[in-house]
Amino acid sequence: MFTFILMFYIGYGIDFNTWVANNNKHFTAVESLRRRAIFNMNARIVAENNRKETFKLSVDGPFAAMTNEEYNSLLKLKRSGEEKGEVRYLNIQAPKAVDWRKKGKVTPIRDQGNCGSCYTFGSIAALEGRLLIEKGGDSETLDLSEEHMVQCTREDGNNGCNGGLGSNVYNYIMENGIAKESDYPYTGSDSTCRSDVKAFAKIKSYNRVARNNEVELKAAISQGLVDVSIDASSVQFQLYKSGAYTDKQCKNNYFALNHEVCAVGYGVVDGKECWIVRNSWGTGWGEKGYINMVIEGNTCGVATDPLYPTGVEYL
């Protein structure tokens, strides 16, 4: 038994060195010992989960050497009150499955880094997708500026790298438009708003999907990408690798939502109907940046507060 445990730790210790190299991490000797211990702790969580669940966890991802508390400090979606906005009932028959990636209407996965700017990435991913669907363009080259929204939406209620809401991003874009990434590149840190950038795209408004209504959310996704918010606080989400994700620990009430992402489709995974959700933590997390979240029971709140831009246009 001792030999097995020793081999287990040595094995994951070797993996820790690989993880450090793959993720370009640089630790002092003391910090490296601490991170290795956390990595080994997470490796035990992975092994236990993967014996019990059909969805898989991994220590390959960017948060493998973080405690769950450290990881949670990165989740900075701000909820200050019940949001208002038009709820549009589409009342259409949605197809059984939709995946906008297969239609070339989803831009590449982005990485928000250590900046609490998920609210910009979720909302802008939905906008980019809707532009491609409604106005055309190249999904590989279309890249709107998250930096523009991080630095310039404070007067709309956001707080830079310390969190915000996608609805505030849409309010800003309605009035001022949004620049291209090449004109206002992402830094992952707080700075002042530049007034010299040219807007590249704009929206007329945005709609909310009826809360906790999975039929209406499917209808909305069948017409384009949708900005959604979730409770991403559990260690299972932190270490997610693949499969149909369900989580008994996560919550789905409005004030528990702490991370903004983007739904790009839905379909069946491992025999379970799932939302296809795009994250903003790079391609090293999850299924090359995506997670399949089980629809039944509103897993982690995907259907709690969805919204999407309308009247999208290039300028």
From Swiss-Prot:
Listed Gene3D superfamilies: Cysteine proteinases
One GO location term (cellular component): lysosome
GO-annotated biological processes: immune response; positive regulation of apoptotic signaling pathway; proteolysis involved in protein catabolic process
Disulfide bonds, paired cysteine numbers: 115-161, 152-193
Residue positions of the active site: 118, 259, 279
Activity regulation behaviour: Inhibited by cysteine protease inhibitors ICP1 and ICP2.
Top enzyme category: hydrolase
MF term (GO), any: cysteine-type endopeptidase activity
Localization, UniProt: Lysosome
EC number from the UniProt entry: 3.4.22.-
Annotated propeptide span(s): 14-93
Highest taxon of source: Eukaryota
Main location: other
Record's signal peptide: 1-13
Keywords tagged on the record: Disulfide bond, Hydrolase, Lysosome, Protease, Signal, Thiol protease, Zymogen
InterPro entries assigned to the protein according to its UniProt record, in alphabetical order: Papain-like_cys_pep_sf, Pept_asp_AS, Pept_cys_AS, Pept_his_AS, Peptidase_C1A, Peptidase_C1A_C, Peptidase_C1A_papain-like, Prot_inhib_I29
Any Pfam family the entry gives: Inhibitor_I29
UniProt keyword annotation of Glycosyltransferase present: no
Family note: Belongs to the peptidase C1 family.
Primary role: Cysteine protease which degrades matrix proteins such as collagen, laminin and fibronectin and thus is involved in the destruction of human tissue. Can abolish adhesion. May play an important role in pathogenicity.
Name recorded for this polypeptide: Cysteine proteinase 1
Organism whose genome encodes this protein: Entamoeba histolytica (strain ATCC 30459 / HM-1:IMSS / ABRM)
Lineage, top ranks: Eukaryota, Amoebozoa, Evosea, Archamoebae, Mastigamoebida
